[in-house]
Curated annotation (Swiss-Prot):
Protein name: Eukaryotic translation initiation factor 6
Any one Gene Ontology cellular component term annotated for this protein: nucleolus
A GO biological process held by the record: maturation of 5.8S rRNA from tricistronic rRNA transcript (SSU-rRNA, 5.8S rRNA, LSU-rRNA)
Post-translational modification: Phosphorylation at Ser-174 and Ser-175 promotes nuclear export.
Signal sequence coordinates: none
Subcellular location: Cytoplasm; Nucleus, Nucleolus
Species: Talaromyces stipitatus (strain ATCC 10500 / CBS 375.48 / QM 6759 / NRRL 1006) (Penicillium stipitatum)
GO molecular function, one term: translation initiation factor activity
Gene: tif6
General function of this protein: Binds to the 60S ribosomal subunit and prevents its association with the 40S ribosomal subunit to form the 80S initiation complex in the cytoplasm. Is also involved in ribosome biogenesis. Associates with pre-60S subunits in the nucleus and is involved in its nuclear export.
Key word Nucleus present: yes
Length: 247
């Protein structure tokens, strides 16, 4: 399902929230209806954590995570880190990352299997991403932009990239990620798809300005209409056991 929301007067949902298949993080404060959109779709399925990072509300731009792990910048206080640990499932590894490019959500785009990262991230950061998130890591650009996390939205089912991404680049990225990609926009033509929306395997939340056409592209590429969260959890478990049986 794809739904629209606004954080106060901002349509940049991906700036104020992080969404994965095992938890969601939503900025503290903000309007109740922003939080209630997440609650309506996610309650009883995954925990929703109200948080700040380094005393700011731009949690979606400062963190990067997936079902297995969560990376936060060194500006995260001990208290904030403890709050995240208390709110998020114990199976999720949480790690502070010492990195000059500290807006991790802008420089890392990942799902549960692969991460595309800013070409200039430290080698040590790359190793932490691979270890904590349990993913293969590739240094990449999206439409010649180094901010992979800003210009791409990705789930385990598919992805949307910057509208000016060439067909050749789309094909190359798609074969790295092993999921279908489309070039598209959010919030009535914004190319900053990663900051404009959040998505997991059954839900996308995007800004109020997002058009019906943009929504239908999301529902199609992320395959959001196909099954609900509970069905999807089963699907993932089955998929993993099938994959394991190959080895």
């Amino acid at each position: 399902m794809a739904v629209r929301a606004q954080f106060e007067n901002s349509n940049e949902v991906g700036v104020f929230a992080t969404l994965t298949n095992s938890y969601a993080i939503v900025a503290i404060g903000g309007s109740e209806n922003f939080y209630s959109v997440f609650e309506a779709e996610l309650q009883d399925v995954i925990p929703i954590c109200h948080a700040s990072i380094g005393g700011t509300r731009i949690v979606g731009r400062l963190t990067a995570g997936n079902r297995k792990g969560l990376l936060v910048p060194t500006s995260t206080t001990d208290q904030e880190l403890q709050h995240l640990r208390n709110s998020i499932p114990d199976s999720v590894k949480i790690q502070r990352v010492e990195e000059r490019l500290s807006a991790l959500g802008n420089v890392i785009c990942c799902n549960d299997h692969v991460a595309l990262i800013h070409p200039d991230l430290e080698r040590e950061t790359e190793e932490i991403i691979a270890d904590v998130l349990g993913v293969e890591v590739f240094r990449q650009t999206v439409a010649d932009n180094v901010l992979t996390g800003s210009y791409m939205a990705l789930s385990n089912q598919g992805g949307i990239v910057h509208p000016k991404t060439s067909i050749r680049d789309q094909d190359e990225l798609s074969s790295l990620l092993q999921v279908p990609l489309v070039a598209g926009s959010v919030n009535r033509g914004s190319p900053v798809v990663g900051a404009g929306m959040v998505v997991n395997d059954w839900l996308a939340v995007t800004g109020l300005d997002t058009t019906a056409t943009e929504l239908s592209v999301m529902e199609s590429v992320f395959r959001l209409g196909e099954m609900g969260a509970k069905g999807l959890g089963m699907g993932n478990a089955n998929k993993e056991s099938i994959v394991e049986s190959f080895y």
